[in-house]
């Protein structure tokens, strides 16, 4: 139900105001008790209902408590600050000015019994008459109040208009910002679309380039395979021909040796000469694979996962010494015969002995050291450099390998996955002795790439990105960097470069 309908239901038809002590008469209509008393006939007999004219006796009045409570609650809700320009009793616009009471009233007040006989004028006309100066200087106080009220009303109206103008200006500004934001969003979407297409196009080019490079390397490898097969077949054919010739000569010599003495003495030099000139000194070259696995952009891709590896000096063999910043390590095993001079030389050369920490297991038999890093997940890449071309080994290992006593046992079987390398080449650490693989140019810097997701550790030439070897170490949950140095060998861990 609308607020106006509720107010109408709670308004007395006689005084046109909220019910005061409402009562019901025989016909069912409700009125204020005071309004009925003021309209009763002097004799006290039955009186007609002001609404339907049905006669009712004064004794038939019944208090309407429900209507009284509803009226009280409604009036209570409407208490509080009355907005300017509204009637404090009925919350209706003040459109009239009561000349008898000298105050503005609403249309409901005009119809009430209180103002039925009063003279009314529109509030704008009343204000205009006073504004134009049609009043004496000795005006009464009620006129001053009226003027103040009307001036306040128009000031408030001016403030509302000013506020409205400000709000309109703000709305225009916000709408402009909204248009700019929509434009920015559209441009951003276009840029995202363009960038997505650019990325897709560039990676498609890169993919095509890699496919072409793959085909080129495979063609080179196939060509090398055919040439090597041809050479091997030629060598095999030549060896077979030599073997057949030797067999024939052996039979011929055997037959000559069984011939009579006179026949043997007739021409012995021919057979002897043929056996002497038979050349069996063939130089068979070792078969090598010359086509290397060099993937373009491999170095750049690996450096995305580069990590800083620090040496755990408390795990190092006593013969290993470290630089002051801890990135260089050297094996001083050859200087063990003069330890005093060796210690002094290490001091002046900037080297220091490994730090000793109580209750930490270290390598006692092999010149090894571990890295501080412990890898359990993710992808990691680091580089190791050897500047003296002596034999070294780098890779990863389990944490419980410090007790190994024999170099020949360093292999995946004991939890070490590494490669040896020196000026002679490189070979996977799967036991001694190993057959080195030549690397051109000479290998002096190796990259180690550990992928815990696939469980593989791969080795690359850090100079040109050529793949060297890959181990599987997926069965181990914790891995650490591993380093082994031959006598007088040294290793350097380069600092991490910027990853882009």
From Swiss-Prot:
Pathway field of the UniProt record reads: Protein modification; protein ubiquitination
What the entry lists under PROSITE patterns is as follows: B302_SPRY (PS50188), ZF_BBOX (PS50119), ZF_RING_1 (PS00518), ZF_RING_2 (PS50089)
| Intracellular or extracellular location(s) | Cytoplasm
The GO molecular function terms of this record are: identical protein binding; ubiquitin protein ligase activity; ubiquitin-protein transferase activity; zinc ion binding
Q: Which InterPro entries match?
A: B30.2/SPRY (IPR001870), B30.2/SPRY_sf (IPR043136), Butyrophylin_SPRY (IPR003879), ConA-like_dom_sf (IPR013320), PRY/SPRY_TRIM4 (IPR035829), SPRY_dom (IPR003877), TRIM/RBCC (IPR050143), Znf_B-box (IPR000315)
Top-level lineage group: Eukaryota
The segments annotated as RING-type zinc fingers are 12-53
> Which Gene Ontology cellular-component terms appear in the entry?
cytoplasm; cytosol; plasma membrane
* GO BP of this protein: innate immune response; protein ubiquitination; regulation of gene expression
Return the broad EC class.
transferase
Q: Does the keyword Coiled coil apply?
A: yes
Cross-referenced SUPFAM superfamilies: B-box zinc-binding domain, Concanavalin A-like lectins/glucanases, RING/U-box
Residue numbers binding Zn(2+): 87, 90, 109, 115
Which parts of the sequence belong to the B30.2/SPRY domain?
288-500
Q: Which residues form a coiled coil?
A: 212-253
Its EC number(s): 2.3.2.27
Q: Where are the zinc fingers (B box-type)?
A: 82-123
Keyword list (alphabetical) reads: Coiled coil, Cytoplasm, Immunity, Innate immunity, Metal-binding, Transferase, Ubl conjugation pathway, Zinc, Zinc-finger
**Reactions catalysed, as given in the entry:** S-ubiquitinyl-[E2 ubiquitin-conjugating enzyme]-L-cysteine + [acceptor protein]-L-lysine = [E2 ubiquitin-conjugating enzyme]-L-cysteine + N(6)-ubiquitinyl-[acceptor protein]-L-lysine
Stated role: E3 ubiquitin-protein ligase. Mediates 'Lys-63'-linked polyubiquitination of the innate immune receptor RIGI, this linkage doesn't lead to proteasomal degradation but seems to enhance IFN induction.
Family affiliation: Belongs to the TRIM/RBCC family.
Q: How does it assemble?
A: Homotrimer.
Q: What is this protein called?
A: E3 ubiquitin-protein ligase TRIM4
Species of provenance: Homo sapiens
